[in-house]
Curated annotation (Swiss-Prot):
Physiological role: Alkaline thrombin-like serine protease. Has fibrinolytic and fibrinogenolytic but not plasminogenolytic activity. Cleaves fibrinogen chains Aalpha, Bbeta and gamma chains in that order. Cleaves after Arg and Lys residues.
Thermoactivity: Optimum temperature is 40 degrees Celsius. Activity is stable from 30 to 60 degrees Celsius and.
Organism annotation: Hediste japonica (Polychaete worm)
GO biological process, one term: proteolysis
Note: On the 2D-gel the determined pI of this protein is: 9.2, its MW is: 33.5 kDa.
Entry's Gene Ontology molecular function annotations: serine-type endopeptidase activity; toxin activity
Signal peptide limits: none
Protein name, entry field: Alkaline serine protease NJP
Description of how activity is regulated: Inhibited by PMSF. Not or very weakly inhibited by EDTA, EGTA, beta-mercaptoethanol, benzamidine, aprotinin, iodoacetic acid, pepstatin A and SBTI.
EC nos: 3.4.21.-
Keyword vocabulary terms for this entry: Fibrinogenolytic toxin, Fibrinolytic toxin, Hemostasis impairing toxin, Hydrolase, Protease, Serine protease, Toxin
Summary of pH dependence: Optimum pH is 9.0. Activity is stable from pH 7 to 11.
Length: 28
């Protein structure tokens, strides 16, 4: 795994986690 691939994977997973977090807080 190259650094670029790691960073892009990390960014996409962080974006998905942020969306889940916002959806979770929006439902409460």
């Amino acid at each position: 795994v190259t650094v670029v691939q790691y960073r892009s994977t990390n960014a996409s997973s962080g974006y998905l986690n942020l969306r889940v977090y916002l959806l979770d807080t929006g439902l409460r």
